[in-house]
């Protein structure tokens, strides 16, 4: 193989390692980031802050994927869906993964340096949590809670970035997004449930068992309730209630239909549809400040 082809192949494998070919994870991190930015600014955020947060979300999502695969190196090879990933398949060496991770973290660090001290501190806490998360599924049945905290962290940072106090609305949004993350990551974990049981990995999907559909429904009702409280508290416009609240209810009903079919492809479709949940909430929030 020529050096040029080798380089192209290596870049392609690194892109797969960072899930560039699967942007759903980036969007699921981006939407709550945008919710927090628009709510903290009461409208369109400062351009520099917006760029820092969007670029930071992209870097940290990719870094999180590398951390997860690095920690799960000895497990992914035994799971049908993950055994072809770059690290367990040998297409990327562990040292190469660490180099890529270091570059991403350096870029994220440079970005966050443009923000204030408390926001920098919160970003360091987020990095620590990112390393803890992959280990939790070996010991507890709710690693999804930690993932929820991680994916909700930018909401707090969005408020501190402009020296705003983390008010009750921010905490409600934080709570809602944490519950939402538990919902969609449980849907995702349902895909690998049989494999996870075989290799001894714990997840909410394994814990819920046959009660998964019902318990996900309870969590979805909690999300709708919290979203309604936020809309009422912030006196959002009718667009919020029509697009966000009503739209989210319809999407959650659709997800219930999908997961009821008890097929892996349907679980994955339900998971993917959460991108539209995040988008609809953002449309409702953004439209309420114009």
UniProtKB/Swiss-Prot annotation:
Give the protein's cofactors. Answer: Mg(2+)
The lineage is: Bacteria, Pseudomonadati, Pseudomonadota, Gammaproteobacteria, Enterobacterales
Q: Where is the signal peptide?
A: none
Compartments annotated for it: namely: Cell inner membrane
Q: Name one GO molecular function term.
A: 4-hydroxybenzoate polyprenyltransferase activity
Reactions the enzyme catalyzes = all-trans-octaprenyl diphosphate + 4-hydroxybenzoate = 4-hydroxy-3-(all-trans-octaprenyl)benzoate + diphosphate
How is the protein disposed in the membrane? Multi-pass membrane protein
Q: Which domain of life is it from?
A: Bacteria
Q: In which pathway does it act?
A: Cofactor biosynthesis; ubiquinone biosynthesis
Keywords per UniProt: Cell inner membrane, Cell membrane, Magnesium, Membrane, Transferase, Transmembrane, Transmembrane helix, Ubiquinone biosynthesis
Record-level GO cellular component terms: plasma membrane
Q: Return the EC number.
A: 2.5.1.39
Q: Which NCBIfam families match?
A: ubiA_proteo
- Indicate the transmembrane segments per the record: 24-44, 48-68, 98-118, 142-162, 171-191, 214-234, 239-259, 270-290
Stored PANTHER family: 4-HYDROXYBENZOATE POLYPRENYLTRANSFERASE, MITOCHONDRIAL (PTHR11048:SF28), PRENYLTRANSFERASES (PTHR11048)
Chief site of localization: membrane
Purpose of the protein? Catalyzes the prenylation of para-hydroxybenzoate (PHB) with an all-trans polyprenyl group. Mediates the second step in the final reaction sequence of ubiquinone-8 (UQ-8) biosynthesis, which is the condensation of the polyisoprenoid side chain with PHB, generating the first membrane-bound Q intermediate 3-octaprenyl-4-hydroxybenzoate.
Q: What is this protein called?
A: 4-hydroxybenzoate octaprenyltransferase
**A Pfam family annotated for this UniProt entry:** UbiA
Instruction: Cite the Gene3D superfamilies for this sequence.
Output: UbiA prenyltransferase (1.20.120.1780)
* PROSITE patterns found in the cross-reference section: UBIA (PS00943)
- The top EC class, named as a word, is transferase
Q: Which GO terms describe its biological process?
A: ubiquinone biosynthetic process
Q: Which family does the similarity line name?
A: Belongs to the UbiA prenyltransferase family.
